[in-house]
Amino acid sequence: MTRIAVIGCGRWGPNYVRNFAELDNAEVVAVSDPNAEAVGRVKHRFPEVEPYADYRKLLQEAPCDAIVVVTPASTHREITEACLGAGKHVLVEKPLADNPGDALALARCARAPGQILMVGHIFRFNAAINKMRDLIYDGTIGQVRYIHCARTNLGPVRADVSVFGDLAPHDISIVLHLLNEMPVTVSATLATYVESGGDLGIMRMRFESGVVAVVYVSWLDPRKRREVEVIGSNAALEFDDMNLSEPLRISQKALRAEPSYSTFGEFQFVAHASNVIIPAIEMREPLRVQCEHFLQCIQTGRQPLTDVEDGLRTCLILAAAERSAQMDGSPVALAGLPESGQ
């Protein structure tokens, strides 16, 4: 039985408490948050959990083996280093840190043999996303040409990070998982209408393989979207996280030129529809799968699928996007990123 403590009881932390509490091989023994009301809500639902206002006191007193850090990204380095120093296994929510310097420091942080440091990139544990990856690598869609991601909603607007820092880590993680390579350059633009940090953003990642990935994120759209499209030479994959019954579609369409006698041009490109396949996918709550994986890593000593290096790569791309946006969208080479948060 692995004893779990959760630091951070805001919007996402209680979901970790619920998932670990429902697993047979885990026990949630403590939670921490400086917000007494947030801690109280968790305590009301899970009376057996010991509440703490200060995570430092939790580290001193709570009899836990592992800690989940679900706090603002700016606090991740301090809290994660303290947890590791106390000998705990750590699962830290995305992003690993709010700057590449802190992320690099965590990647280099000394850990005892078998001590686990995992980053919570939840879509790596989504069955439909993993099916997309399988279909790419078995040649079903041919050569990948480009990827388009959209992650939008009407709020919640945050003051501590830009919309890139809030939403884009999901799509960056998905793209890296699907392509298994780092981008060569990143370019981005941010628009500010509500929060000074930027509440609408477009990011473009260019890869050495020739693939271009575009990520659109917004806090201002009226419709909640969680979509990923992968366009190949033979077919396209369409992932819609809001479609619970059919999250993935394989669209087998071809684009060809044929004669046209209209006044609009000599040739007209037309898309010829073919089969649309809905693959059968056994969907489970990705957060539950992620929690199970964390426990398996603790029990076996295996390296997490979303390890600290994986989290560092996402942070490097985020930093490149933020820098590009400050330079009116000029491309930023990944090799040119600083190694400190100064």
Enumerate the language-model features and the residues they cover.
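N-terminal Rossmann-like dinucleotide-binding module
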Residues: M1-F46
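Conserved SAM-binding strand-loop segment of SAM-dependent methyltransferases
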Residues: E48-Y55
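Beta-strand-loop-alpha-helix segment that lines the small-molecule cofactor/substrate pocket
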Residues: E61, A66-R124
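Basic phosphate/pyrophosphate-binding loop/patch that engages nucleotide-derived ligands
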Residues: R108-I116, K131-V144, G232-A236
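C-terminal glycine/acidic-rich active-site capping loop/insertion
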Residues: I122, N234-L305, S330, L334, ...
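Rossmann-like dinucleotide-binding domain that binds NAD(P)(H)
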Residues: T152-R223, E229, N243, E309
